[in-house]
Amino acid sequence: IGVYGSFAAKTLANRLNAKEFRCAVDNFVQQAEMELGQYYKTKDVKGNEGVVRHIILSEVLICPECDKELSYFENGTKRNPVQFTKTITCPHCGKTHDTDTFKPALENIYDSLLKKEIVRKKREPVWVYGTTNGKNWDRKVNDEDRVLIKMLEEQEFEESDIPREICWGELHRTGYHLGITHLHQFYTKRNYTVMFKLWKLTERYPNNVREALQLLLLSYNSTHCTLMTRVVAKRNAKDFVLTGAQSGVLYISKLPVEKNILLGLKRKSIPFEEAYGLLEKCTGELIIHNSSSEKMLEKTGSIDFVFTDPPFGDFIPYAEVNQINELWLNHTTDREKEIIISPSQEKSVADYQWMLTRVFTEISRVLKPDHYAAVVFHAAKAKIWEAFEHAILDSGLAVCMTSIQGMRGLPIIPLSLIHI
């Protein structure tokens, strides 16, 4: 039922060859740099023209002692070696408190896409990483940077743009999601504008090329284009290490990062080019359904083999995570049919078991007699394992083989099921 997953599968199977894809990406990136490159122009420490690689933003905090504002980056972190401090000494009153006792500063701004005033966390750009003539550099944000960013913040949204509401569930946190109700609020104004214009730019290409370029954008989007991009501190590192969004959640750190989207696209395109190359010599027909597996379209006894990787109970709310990409497609996953345990959707373990049973029953129906299904599953809770076991046994399938394979420290259990 996943809209993003179905779109990705359909697009990779659209018979575009690797050379066509590479030519399209090269042309797309060239056009994007010509039309949007000015959004990331900056100057190095000597005043020479350069390009932004990324900018660290910092939450502004409120001192619990004197109620004055201070920068988390300036007062709660250190460089060379990098560390996040457990305490902060207020630069105004000199009092020291645990970092967690400093509340975030808030600001009222007019959201011109929503056409109303909103309250959000106050964040400020603090450190710029750039490149000039192939040489990388970094420096503190200066007044010229602040003027440019303020100007971008005050720009109107595109006339054709519309608000796209976030449907919150288990992942919403009152702290770091404060003021985020719509898609555009997950981005800096600059990166949302660039992403919107890039999306519009894809519409100049034929359908199969357009969708390939859109998939490229979406593969980079939630991990690297939003405020969920972050920096981390590694032991004895001289500077912060840039990393993408934390997987499986919609976490925004106290030090979100604004990355230059244009720089990442060409690098991100390489695995897609390789995938198209691998598929060039494939024969046969591939049919992709964006529908629930509780009611399959395949005929009874028509399938030789099934592979499935069902949601692991309450482990990850996939539809909630994927909406950051799916909202760009103007179509999101139907959560009513999502097989997970979810208090926000009022789905219990019993509901999960019942829906999973229906899927396994359908697998049993479409499989040929004495043919197999492989299932990958993991759960850390006994009640979820019990639900999974009952779903299999009640479906007409039987377990004929199991194996355990560790993945990132978690046991993954592939099961071989046979239709009997």
Feature map (PLM): residue ranges:
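Nucleic-acid modification enzymes, centered on SAM-dependent nucleic-acid methyltransferases
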Residues: 1-299, 318-345, 352, 359, ...
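A short glycine-rich, Lys/Arg-flanked "PGG" loop and its adjoining helix->strand segment in the class I
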Residues: 353-369
